[in-house]
């Protein structure tokens, strides 16, 4: 069943920058957003992130833990512990892709969140659990007869590197996003950011190595915040080197979430719109062309 939710939005207009955000001028009006709600049983779609509080919702046939947009093909994929799905963003229909999970390639059922995003340099998707589990799904057709195609492999669990300001802290990654998410093609390089609800920080994540380095604390209006693990984070790129970061954030103690732009240098979150609901898990945006 499809439902439409419309709420008042915050009007805004900001200028573009390579490490921050585009803003909601005409260049953003064609970018769609996708999220999960109601414990992963509902797909939420934003026809345009220029009006993020105008949403359509679709009841899913299976619970999903996360969603990710595949820049090379324009597909939306979903992950549930033990399965990878293609997701029809216009209906919410799920198709199990029959992925093989290697030994240990599972995120704990007790994990509060799962992050998921495509590495556009290799066209494979990384899933990171708040429990530290670090997985990669290599899609159908990956590489040239690559034996990893349509399988999920486990890599080094996430940890803060020696000398980091959060060294010794147990991370709770709930969202991740790669730069250079250009539409329709692989990127020459990418860099992975993530959000940690335990340290309330924007961090870098060194792919298979699992190494975390703190970039900055997340702030709103210059003040530190207490992030919950409900929400998501993604980057859209008009071209290589031009990255716009967006996030759905819900603060601890709040019942509803907000839609924010994220400065990838300072960690500053700028409110773009108050959303009419909370409890989101996962977030993805479509390509930027």
Model-derived regions: residue spans:
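Structural motif
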Residues: 40-46, 83-88, 132-139, 198-207, ...
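Blade-level signature of beta-propeller repeat domains, shared across WD40, Kelch, NHL, RCC1
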Residues: 268-289
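Structural signature of eukaryotic scaffold interfaces centered on beta-propeller domains
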Residues: 19-28, 66-74, 105-123, 168-188, ...
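A short beta-strand motif characteristic of beta-propeller blades
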Residues: 51-59, 93-106, 146-166, 211-225, ...
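An edge-strand/N-cap motif at the start of beta-rich repeat modules
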Residues: 23-49
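Conserved beta-propeller blade signature
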Residues: 32-36, 74-78, 85, 123-127, ...
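Short, solvent-exposed loop/turn segments at conserved positions within beta-propeller repeat blades
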Residues: 28, 36-39, 79, 128-130, ...
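Gram-negative bacterial Sec-dependent N-terminal signal peptides
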Residues: 1-20
């Amino acid at each position: 069943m499809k439902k439409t939710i419309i709420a008042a939005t915050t009007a805004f207009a900001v200028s573009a920058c390579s490490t921050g955000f585009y803003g909601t001028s005409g260049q953003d009006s064609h970018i769609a957003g996708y999220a999960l709600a109601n414990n992963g049983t509902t797909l939420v779609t934003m026809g345009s992130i220029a009006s993020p509080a105008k949403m359509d919702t679709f009841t899913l046939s299976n619970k999903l833990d996360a969603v990710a947009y595949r820049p090379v093909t324009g597909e939306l994929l979903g992950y549930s512990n033990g399965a990878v799905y293609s997701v029809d963003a216009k209906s919410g229909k799920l198709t199990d892709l029959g992925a093989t999970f290697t030994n240990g390639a599972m995120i704990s059922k007790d994990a509060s969140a799962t992050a998921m995003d495509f590495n556009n340099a290799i066209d494979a998707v990384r899933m990171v659990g708040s429990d530290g589990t670090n997985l990669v799904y290599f899609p159908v057709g990956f590489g040239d007869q690559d034996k990893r195609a349509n399988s999920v492999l486990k890599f080094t669990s996430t940890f803060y590197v020696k000398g980091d300001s959060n060294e010794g802290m147990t991370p709770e990654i709930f969202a991740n996003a790669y730069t250079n998410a250009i539409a329709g093609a692989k990127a020459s390089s990418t860099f992975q950011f993530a959000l940690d609800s335990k340290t309330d920080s924007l961090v870098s994540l060194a792919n298979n190595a699992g190494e975390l380095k703190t970039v900055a604390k997340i702030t709103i209006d210059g003040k530190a915040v207490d992030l919950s693990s409900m929400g998501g984070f993604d980057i859209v790129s008009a071209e290589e080197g031009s990255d716009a970061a967006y996030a759905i954030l819900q603060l601890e103690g709040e019942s509803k979430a907000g839609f924010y732009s994220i400065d990838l240098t300072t960690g500053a979150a700028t409110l773009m719109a108050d959303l009419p609901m909370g409890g989101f898990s996962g977030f993805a945006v479509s390509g930027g062309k």
